[in-house]
Amino acid sequence: MRHYEIVIMVHPDQSEQVPAMVERYTSSVNAGGGKVHRLEDWGRRHMAYPINKIHKAHYVLMNIECSQEVIDELMHNFRFNDAILRDLVIRRKDAVTEVSPIKAAESREQRAPRGEDRPARVVADDVDDSDDDTDDEDSNDE
């Protein structure tokens, strides 16, 4: 069996149906003897360019291991599902199980200190002004 990475972009009006879609696709992979190695719901994000005058989409990333018949069935389902704006299927050499950079960035943002917990900011007025480059003595030489 081969390893694949799949990213689907779902219409933002259909965001509440995403868990059911993902469940249907993962059960299809499991029924075909495959395995889901990674499943990440990136949520609603702004797209790089509009598709059919839509500027946001709900993103889902899956890394799976399955046979060619199962991936053909998935791609057929993606093509005829009107809720899916775009899909990308990439064949990988190995199973990818670590957290994606997008999800890692989101978790870093959630862990970052906010408000009162954040360290104090250095204000520019606190800097010593004694290293001023202007010489007051040279201006009187005229």
Swiss-Prot record:
Residues 125-142 have a biased composition (Acidic residues). The gene is rpsF. It comes from Hahella chejuensis (strain KCTC 2396). It comes from the Bacteria. Belongs to the bacterial ribosomal protein bS6 family. NCBIfam families: S6. InterPro entries: Ribosomal_bS6 (IPR000529), Ribosomal_bS6_sf (IPR035980), Ribosomal_S6_plastid/chlpt (IPR020814), Transl_elong_EF1B/ribsomal_bS6 (IPR014717). This is Small ribosomal subunit protein bS6. Residues 103-142 are annotated as: Disordered. Residues 105-124 have a biased composition (Basic and acidic residues). One of its GO terms (cellular component) is cytosolic small ribosomal subunit. Keywords: Ribonucleoprotein, Ribosomal protein, RNA-binding, rRNA-binding. Binds together with bS18 to 16S ribosomal RNA. The lineage of its organism: Bacteria, Pseudomonadati, Pseudomonadota, Gammaproteobacteria, Oceanospirillales.
